[in-house]
From Swiss-Prot:
Stated family: Belongs to the HrcA family.
Origin: domain of life: Bacteria
PANTHER family for this protein: HEAT-INDUCIBLE TRANSCRIPTION REPRESSOR HRCA (PTHR34824:SF1)
Organism: Pseudarthrobacter chlorophenolicus (strain ATCC 700700 / DSM 12829 / CIP 107037 / JCM 12360 / KCTC 9906 / NCIMB 13794 / A6) (Arthrobacter chlorophenolicus)
SUPFAM superfamilies, per database record: GAF domain-like, Winged helix' DNA-binding domain
Name recorded for this polypeptide: Heat-inducible transcription repressor HrcA
Record keywords: Repressor, Stress response, Transcription, Transcription regulation
């Protein structure tokens, strides 16, 4: 069997199995695809593909299904990620625009990607090692109670209510906010802790206790902003794909619940020349994802943070890759540089 025909037969098997969920036989391939050869020749071709470990027979079925190795060869032969339709692009644009709140943008993003792919969608919060302080706000709730708000240029908003240890008037708190913001605006979050002592020491002794409490709160908020987190949507799609996880869907749900597993996997996935990364079945380092595939890409500055989907290995890879990459590009555009 020639290499082009091998790839053509494999492609036909993958496409039929993805859409039908049924093992694929030689007769069905001849009827549905213009392969230009007889059913007997296709049977021989399928036997050769099985010998190479690219397809396998589930139980005693007469048909064949792709293996992880077969899916990998199929995915690697996708020369370029196809663009989405104009209607799909308009839908993405209209759903993602119109919000400046990072949490809202990411929540919309995963819900949209889940709807486009019928898979579980996940997105890492932006990596904030280079994020800068855009705004600081202190709101007096009671004479000693203050709401501290820290906003980064990435869109992250962190807030915390603290006891400043002394009574403060509105004008005194406003003066402290002006001093903190005037000194710290534009400071990288990663360097905030080193910059705070100078601000505190510049405050009059009578307000230094409050200034120290405010500085401590800002340091905690900056640390919270830099923690690796993710948001996801579409776990119900896994339940509808229960047949695709013959061993158990439990380990897949556990991997999603244990965010550290997904975050580590996303961080380790390297994009290829098409701008996406695909990890199939047992290629995943976590055993619980042996029956799942992950398609991801980077977004934002330097494409460090990842967005992607998780689903069964029986997946429409071309359309999924296109949706992931398109949504990532719109997300990058909305969040800006």
């Amino acid at each position: 069997m020639s290499e082009p025909r091998k790839l053509e037969v494999l492609r036909a098997i993958v496409e039929d199995y993805v859409h039908s969920r049924e093992p694929v036989g030689s007769k069905a391939l001849v009827e549905r695809h213009h392969l230009g050869v007889s059913s007997a020749t296709i049977r021989n071709d399928m036997a050769a593909l099985e010998d190479e470990g690219l397809i396998t027979a589930p139980h005693t079925s007469a048909g064949r299904i792709p293996t992880d190795k077969g899916y990998r060869l199929f995915v690697d032969q996708i020369s370029a990620v196809k663009p989405l339709s104009q209607a799909e692009r308009r839908a993405i644009q209209s759903l993602l625009e119109g919000s400046d709140d990072l949490d809202d943008v990411l929540d919309r993003t995963v819900r949209l990607l889940s709807q486009l792919t019928n898979q579980v969608a996940v997105v890492q919060y932006p990596h904030l090692s280079r994020a800068l302080i855009r705004h600081i706000e202190f709101v007096l709730l009671a004479p000693r109670k203050v709401l501290v708000v820290l906003i980064a240029n990435s869109g992250n908003v962190e807030q915390r209510v603290i006891d400043v240890g002394q009574d403060l008037a509105d004008d005194a708190l406003s003066a402290l906010r002006t001093r903190f913001l005037g000194t710290l605006a534009g400071t990288p979050l990663a360097r905030l802790a080193q910059a705070l002592p100078a601000v505190v020491s510049s405050v009059s002794p009578g307000e230094r206790q409050a200034a120290q409490a405010l500085a401590h709160a800002l340091e905690i908020l900056a640390h919270s902003s830099r923690e690796d987190r993710m948001v996801m949507a579409g776990t119900a799609n896994l339940a509808r794909s229960n047949v695709d996880f013959p061993l158990s869907i439990g380990p897949v749900l556990e991997a999603l619940e244990e965010q550290v597993v997904m975050l580590r996997l996303l961080s380790d996935m390297a994009q290829d020349h098409r701008g996406v990364a695909v990890s199939i079945g047992r290629e995943n380092p976590y055993d619980g994802l042996a029956e799942a595939s992950v398609v991801a890409t980077g977004y934002g500055p330097d494409s460090v943070a990842k967005i992607g989907i998780l689903g069964p290995t029986r997946m429409d890879y071309p359309n999924t890759m296109a949706a992931v990459r398109a949504v990532a590009r719109y997300l990058s555009r909305i969040l800006g540089p």
